[in-house]
From Swiss-Prot:
Family per record: Belongs to the protein arginine deiminase family.
Subunit structure: Monomer.
Name under which the protein is recorded: Protein-arginine deiminase type-1
Taxonomic lineage of the native organism: Eukaryota, Metazoa, Chordata, Craniata, Vertebrata
InterPro entries (alphabetical): Cupredoxin (IPR008972), PAD (IPR004303), PAD_C (IPR013530), PAD_central_sf (IPR036556), PAD_N (IPR013732), PAD_N_sf (IPR038685), Prot_Arg_deaminase_cen_dom (IPR013733)
Superkingdom, taxonomy of origin: Eukaryota
Residues binding Ca(2+) 4: Q351, F409, L412
Gene3D superfamilies: L-arginine/glycine Amidinotransferase, Chain A (3.75.10.10), Protein-arginine deiminase, central domain (2.60.40.1700), Protein-arginine deiminase, N-terminal domain (2.60.40.1860)
Pfam families assigned to the protein according to its UniProt record, in alphabetical order: PAD (PF03068), PAD_M (PF08527), PAD_N (PF08526)
Reactions it catalyzes: L-arginyl-[protein] + H2O = L-citrullyl-[protein] + NH4(+)
Example of a GO MF term: calcium ion binding
Alphabetical UniProt keywords: Calcium, Cytoplasm, Hydrolase, Metal-binding
Cofactor(s), names only, from the UniProt record: Ca(2+)
C-alpha cells in the first residue's frame, strides 16, 4: 500500500481524485470551510462508501437529520467498490452549515475515478493464482501459513543450450514457463486514466539479482515473452493496451538461499501520476516470494534411479560388480544408469561427486543435483549428463587451496524425519562429517556448509569423521527403512560388536576360522590371530570411542533411543593415525527400499556360512529387509571405498510439503 493519502477539498472548484478499489482515501474537510460553519453533511453517489472516523469520547454521532460537528476529532474517509467506467463517475458532496441555518453556507464537490489495481500471486499455495484480500507481502511458515514460492530455474529445458535456463535473460522454450511462478496484474479502469497515469513494476536493488520477470502477451511464440525486470533492470513501465484488465507475468528464481540471502524477495506495482513534479505515487501493491530450498532425500524414500560407473584398473573391469548392481536394481524395481568410462575418466566414486535432491513449489517440482567441489574425473558428469529438462543443477565453488576429502559427498547424508524434544523435523536433518570440536582438523568447506544451513528445512548436524582416513560419515553410519512404527533404523559400524562376535565363535571352538577366506589377493587372518593382535585391539578401541561419540550426538540431535540403533560388526585399523576398514565396510551399503546391497565382508566361514553375513542377516532381516552381499573387494574396498561410495541413488521426493513446516 502507498502511504496514507489525503485529498483536500475546495469551496471554489470541484476536486478530482483517483481512488483504488478497496483502498481508503482520507478527505480533508477542515482546511477550506465557509466562515461561521460549525457542522457538515456528506452525501455520496452509488458505488462510493463514505464513513467517519472520530473520537467517541469527544464527538457525538448525529442521529437522523442531525449534522456532524466540524470538529478536528472527526475525519472523513471514502472508498469505492468497483472500477469506474468513465472518468469522474463517482461523486461525493460535503455541505457546510452554520449555528442556526438550514441553508448550506457552502459546498465542496469531490469527483472520484475508481481503478482496480492489484498484484496477485499464489499466496494460498494451491498452485493457482487467486485474488487475495490478505497480506501478500509477508511470508509465513506452517500449515496455516501463506506466501508465494519461487523455483530456482536451474534446469535446462532447451537441448540447444549448454547452460541452465537461469543463465539466459530471454526465454529459451515455452516449457520454461512451467518452472516460473505466475503473477497477475489487475488494471481495470477507464482507458483515459491510464493514458495520463503510469503503472510501474519494481524490484528492489537487493533482490534484482535474485529474480527475473517476464511479461506475457498471450502468444505461443518465444518473442511474446519479454524480460522486464531482473539484474540491471529495476523498473518497468507497464504497457497496458486499451480495455486490458489483466496482464500476466512469470517470475523466475535465480539464486538459492545462502549465507548472504535469506531466500525472500519482493516485487511491487505502483500507480504513478506523472502530471506533477516530482511524480506522485498514488498507490503501491507489493507481493513477497520465498525461494524454494534444495531438499535432500534419505534412504527411507523409495529409489527411482541408481547410478554407477564402468571403470577399468589393474584388476580388470568392474563388470561383475555392474552385473550385481543390475540384479539388485531389478529386484528393487529401480532404473539403472551406468556412467561410461569415457565420461567418468576412470573415477568410480560417484557418491562423492554429487548428491541428488529436489526443489518444489505448489505448481511444480523437479530433481536437482548438487555437484560437489571435489572436481576429479567425474567433475563434468553432473553438468553435462544430468542437467536437462526438469532436472536442475547447483554447485558451490570453494577458494584455494581447494577441496579436502571431507568436501566429497560421501561425507553428506540426511536422516529420515525425526522429532527431537517436541521439535519436528519432517524432512529429516542433514548430517555432515567434520573434525573433532576444537581440534583444528579437516572440515567440509564453509561455502558448502553455509549453503546447506541456509536451506533451513533440514537443519544440519555436524559429526566427527576426521578420525577416518577418507573422513566420510558413510563409513560408519547409514539408515534403513523399516515397516514398524518408527519407520527406520540407524546402522552404526561397531568394532565392539565384531570383537564380541569373534570371541563367541572362538569360545564355540571356531578360533581357526579365518577372515578373508576365499580371497586370492589377501592373507587370511584367523579369529584367534585377530583377537590376539594387540595393535588391532588398540586401533578398534580408538575407533569405537570415535563412533560412540557420534552415537551420543546422533541420539541427542535426532531424538533416538538405543532401540533405534543397530550395531553392525566392523573392524578398522589405523594407518598414519587415521582409520581404514579392516574388511569391507558393511554399513557402506546401498539402500534400495527393502533391498540392501551390502559389501561382502569375507568373514570367517563357520558351518559353510560367513559368520559376519549371518550376524547381519539376523539383525536386519527381522525388520523386513533383504540382505544381498556383493563382492566389491578389488574394485572398491582396496581403494578405500565400498558400494555406497561407488553408487548414487535418486529418490522420490517427500510427500510432505516443506512450506508446511516451521523451522
Amino acid at each position: 500500500m502507498a502511504p496514507k493519502r489525503v485529498v483536500q477539498l475546495s469551496l471554489k472548484m470541484p476536486t478530482h481524485a483517483v481512488c483504488v478499489v478497496g483502498v481508503e482515501a482520507h478527505v480533508d474537510i477542515h482546511s477550506d470551510v465557509p466562515k461561521g460553519a460549525n457542522s457538515f453533511r456528506v452525501s455520496g453517489s452509488s458505488g462510493v462508501e463514505v464513513f467517519m472516523v472520530y473520537n467517541r469520547t469527544r464527538v457525538k454521532e448525529p442521529i437522523g437529520k442531525a449534522r456532524w460537528p466540524l470538529d478536528t476529532d472527526a475525519d472523513m474517509v471514502v472508498s469505492v467498490g468497483t472500477a469506474s467506467k468513465e472518468l469522474k463517475d463517482f461523486k461525493v458532496r460535503v455541505s457546510y452549515f452554520g449555528e442556526q441555518e438550514d441553508q448550506a453556507l457552502g459546498r465542496s464537490v469531490l469527483y472520484l475515478t475508481g481503478v482496480d489495481i492489484s498484484l496477485e500471486v499464489d499466496t494460498g499455495r494451491t498452485g493457482k493464482v487467486k485474488r487475495s484480500q490478505g497480506d501478500k507481502k509477508t511470508w509465513r511458515w506452517g500449515p496455516e501459513g501463506y506466501g508465494a514460492i519461487l523455483l530456482v530455474n536451474c534446469d535446462r529445458d532447451n537441448h540447444r543450450s549448454a547452460e541452465p535456463d537461469l543463465t539466459h535473460s530471454w526465454l529459451m522454450s515455452l516449457a520454461d514457463l512451467q518452472d516460473m511462478s505466475p503473477m497477475l496484474l489487475s488494471c481495470n479502469g477507464p482507458d483515459k486514466l491510464f493514458d495520463s497515469h503510469k503503472l510501474v513494476l519494481n524490484v528492489p536493488f537487493s533482490d534484482s539479482k535474485r529474480v527475473r520477470v517476464f511479461c506475457a502477451r498471450g502468444g505461443n511464440s518465444l518473442s511474446d515473452y519479454k524480460q522486464v525486470l531482473g539484474p540491471q533492470c529495476l523498473s518497468y513501465e507497464v504497457e497496458r493496451q486499451p480495455g486490458e484488465q489483466e496482464i500476466k507475468f512469470y517470475v523466475e528464481g535465480l539464486t538459492f538461499p545462502d549465507a548472504d540471502f535469506l531466500g525472500l524477495v519482493s516485487l511491487s506495482v505502483s500507480l504513478v501520476d506523472p502530471g506533477t513534479l516530482p511524480e506522485v505515487t498514488l498507490f503501491t501493491d507489493t507481493v513477497g516470494f520465498r525461494m524454494a530450498p534444495w531438499i535432500m532425500t534419505p534412504n527411507t524414500q523409495p529409489p527411482e534411479e541408481l547410478y554407477v560407473c564402468r571403470v577399468m584398473d589393474t584388476h580388470g573391469s568392474n563388470e561383475k560388480f555392474l552385473e550385481d548392481m543390475s540384479y539388485l536394481t531389478l529386484k528393487a524395481n529401480c532404473k539403472l544408469t551406468i556412467c561410461p568410462q569415457v565420461e567418468n575418466r576412470n573415477d568410480r566414486w560417484i557418491q562423492d561427486e554429487m548428491e541428488f535432491g529436489y526443489i518444489e513449489a505448489p505448481h511444480k517440482s523437479f530433481p536437482v543435483v548438487f555437484d560437489s567441489p571435489r572436481n576429479r574425473g567425474l567433475k563434468d558428469f553432473p553438468y553435462k549428463r544430468i542437467l536437462g529438462p526438469d532436472f536442475g543443477y547447483v554447485t558451490r565453488e570453494i577458494p584455494l587451496p581447494g577441496p579436502s576429502s571431507l568436501d566429497s559427498f560421501g561425507n553428506l547424508d540426511v536422516s529420515p524425519p525425526v522429532t527431537v524434544g517436541g521439535t519436528e523435523y519432517p524432512l529429516g536433518r542433514i548430517l555432515i562429517g567434520s573434525s573433532f570440536p576444537k581440534s583444528g582438523g579437516r572440515q567440509m568447506a564453509r561455502a558448502v556448509r553455509n549453503f546447506l544451513k541456509a536451506q533451513q528445512v533440514q537443519a544440519p548436524v555436524e559429526l566427527y569423521s576426521d578420525w577416518l582416513s577418507v573422513g566420510h560419515v558413510d563409513e560408519f553410519l547409514t539408515f534403513v527403512p523399516t515397516s514398524d512404527q518408527k519407520g527406520f533404523r540407524l546402522l552404526l559400524a561397531s568394532p565392539s560388536a565384531c570383537l564380541k562376535l569373534f570371541q563367541e565363535k572362538k569360545e564355540e571352538g571356531y578360533g581357526e576360522a579365518a577372515q578373508f577366506d576365499g580371497l586370492k589377493h589377501q592373507a587370511k587372518r584367523s579369529i584367534n590371530e585377530m583377537l590376539a593382535d594387540r595393535h588391532l585391539q588398540r586401533d578398534n578401541l580408538h575407533a569405537q570411542k570415535c563412533i560412540d561419540w557420534n552415537r551420543n550426538v546422533l541420539k541427542r540431535e535426532l531424538g533416538l533411543a538405543e532401540s533405534d540403533i543397530v550395531d553392525i560388526p566392523q573392524l578398522f585399523f589405523l594407518k598414519n593415525f587415521y582409520a581404514e576398514a579392516f574388511f569391507p565396510d558393511m554399513v557402506n551399503m546401498v539402500v534400495l527400499g527393502k533391498y540392501l546391497g551390502i559389501p561382502k565382508p569375507y568373514g570367517p566361514i563357520i558351518n559353510g556360512r560367513c559368520c559376519l553375513e549371518e550376524k547381519v542377516q539376523s539383525l536386519l532381516e527381522p525388520l523386513g529387509l533383504h540382505c544381498i552381499f556383493i563382492d566389491d573387494y578389488l574394485s572398491y574396498h582396496e581403494l578405500q571405498g565400498e558400494i555406497h561410495c561407488g553408487t548414487n541413488v535418486r529418490r522420490k521426493p517427500f510427500p510432505f510439503k516443506w512450506w508446511n513446516m516451521v523451522p
